[in-house]
Amino acid sequence: MPDSLDQQLSSYAYHLPPERIAQAPVEPRHDARLLIAPGQTDGVQAARHQKVWDLLEELRSGDLLVVNDTRVLKARIKVRRSGGGVSELLVLEPRGDGQWLCLARPAKRMRPGDLLTLDGTAITLRVLHEDPASGGRIVQFPLDCRDAESIEALLNQCGEVPLPPYIDRHDPGDAERYQTRYADRPGAVAAPTAGLHFSDELLAALQGKGVGLARITLHVGLGTFRPVETEDLTQLELHSEWIEVNASVVEAIQQCRGRVIAVGTTSVRALEGAAQLQGGVLKPFTGPVNLVIQPGYRFAVVQGLLTNFHLPKSSLLLLVSALIGREKLLALYAEAIDHEYRFFSYGDAMWISPDAVLPGVTPN
């Protein structure tokens, strides 16, 4: 059972020196550092410091990696307002008939009825109304831009990859580097960052060892940009995100001879969300999920996790704490800072094996 501190947002604060925030990815991808969490019977001092390539020694034949195959859209676009001036839109999600929810900057200068010209084109957009739930704007795009697949060609012409605000760089290489090697289904506005560590060489080596790969889809959306502001975490609610867990994934998990390992928190949310919406049993599912995973949660599917280092007081920190324990996780973060690990999207990774998770929180 979680203690009272586990249920307070302030308990998930930690100090991160700014120089520990990764501003660029390492090359090759698998050369990122890997903090290996100790088993629950060991002290924090037993953590090991390796490279992502060393997952080859940690994973076994018969294990199954579940990855998120979402592809990041070039969703940040510049528009010229009819009254003059340039604004920025972050295109988030479709609302039907060519209408899209967008975050606007500066928002106060974008009013219902405003006409916008997509920078570098003659394409006209119209601001329809404000979205009260998000503070964003519903914007009318051309009618054929009805979903992520159909708007992607337009965004590829004039958009930019929406790197997180803590990354201060503009590099054309991000269009490729801020995608996983297996990114396939367009729709995200942020990358599932744990997957960025897998190079083609590492994926091939894991396959050669007998490690399986299954693909879910979770389009990382507005929730990524929303800080948790609820101090009492028993009252926490999260923004919904669209997922697909298809029949082939369910079958692969049912037939898995080893351990089910989630690559990233998005894979955890998809698998666990699909299960919890269907009585705790994993079945094929397509639709929105807003599952809150925090200490006290009992996992229905996931047994281990590869993850990046997350922002203080974030929902992702709560999720990882549910698996390994808040105090242990924060101690490992302190060790990572002392050892000069690189944090956040382009940063290093942590491996939480099934031996390292809290007793009784994952399926056998």
Swiss-Prot record:
Its EC number is 2.4.99.17. It comes from Synechococcus sp. (strain CC9902). It comes from the Bacteria. It holds the Pfam family Queuosine_synth. This is S-adenosylmethionine:tRNA ribosyltransferase-isomerase. One of its GO terms (cellular component) is cytoplasm. Pathway: tRNA modification; tRNA-queuosine biosynthesis. It is found in: Cytoplasm. GO terms for molecular function: S-adenosylmethionine:tRNA ribosyltransferase-isomerase activity. Monomer. The lineage of its organism: Bacteria, Bacillati, Cyanobacteriota, Cyanophyceae, Synechococcales. Belongs to the QueA family. It catalyses: 7-aminomethyl-7-carbaguanosine(34) in tRNA + S-adenosyl-L-methionine = epoxyqueuosine(34) in tRNA + adenine + L-methionine + 2 H(+). NCBIfam families: PRK00147.1 (NF001140), queA (TIGR00113). Transfers and isomerizes the ribose moiety from AdoMet to the 7-aminomethyl group of 7-deazaguanine (preQ1-tRNA) to give epoxyqueuosine (oQ-tRNA). Keywords: Cytoplasm, Queuosine biosynthesis, S-adenosyl-L-methionine, Transferase. HAMAP family: QueA (MF_00113). InterPro entries: QueA, QueA_dom1, QueA_dom2, QueA_sf. The gene is queA.
